[in-house]
A protein has these predicted regions:
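Flexible, compositionally biased loop and terminal segments
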Residues: 1-199
């Protein structure tokens, strides 16, 4: 016979939205969820290859998974989600695969913009955005501008991003400020460095 606690949990689950009900049933405390989740979107090509499928098909399935991740994160009330979608190393893949990934990114932005608006999601992008094809940059910038004032979850897309490249960028900015007298090198703190990183 089920205990009182189990009965109560089952009753509460029936009154909650599906995602929260699932979390309650698994015993996860909604008050102890993180405020920022970061996910490296990796392995789509390998997933497809293991199933004797085209790598590009794997990336298409990965794009579908992104929708689920964004929806779940938003429903949980997690304020910030960062998806590492395309690294600086990804430029070394075949031109066909890179082209397919850029096309997928553009389609994703176009199809998900209305969803972001409806759910108050604010889009942000980090990385060497200037390396993306111009048409992709245009759609990305339009989506960022359209969602800029949305008060809900922040979705960061890391595109043409690498942590080493970010450190180099931050170091160059600080060095340039120091050389032009706008920054005293002795005043550099952890906070100064954090303020010059993407997020």
């Amino acid at each position: 016979m089920p205990s009182t606690a189990k009965k109560r949990k089952k009753f509460l689950s029936s009154k909650l939205p599906p995602i929260e009900a699932t979390i309650l049933e698994k015993g996860i405390d909604l008050h102890r969820l993180p405020v920022h989740v970061a996910i490296i979107m990796d392995g789509n090509g390998r997933w497809a290859k293991l199933r004797l499928l085209n790598r590009i098909y794997g990336h298409e399935k990965g794009a579908e998974t992104v929708r689920t991740i964004v929806t779940t994160t938003r429903e949980l009330g997690i304020p910030t989600l960062t998806l590492y979608a395309f690294s600086t190393e990804n430029w070394q893949r075949s031109s066909l695969e890179v082209s397919a990934l850029m096309s997928l990114l553009k389609k994703f932005l176009e199809s998900e913009k209305p969803v972001m608006m409806e759910n108050n999601i604010r889009l942000n992008a980090i990385g060497q955005i200037e390396r993306l094809p111009q048409d992709v940059q245009d759609v990305l910038n339009q989506t960022i501008a359209a969602t800029r004032h949305n008060p809900g979850m922040v979705l960061n897309l890391a595109l043409s991003y690498g942590s080493r490249a970010e450190i180099v960028r931050m170091t160059r900015i600080l060095a340039e400020k120091a050389m032009t007298g706008r920054l005293d090198p002795q005043s550099i703190t952890e906070e100064t460095i954090a303020a010059h990183l993407y997020t």
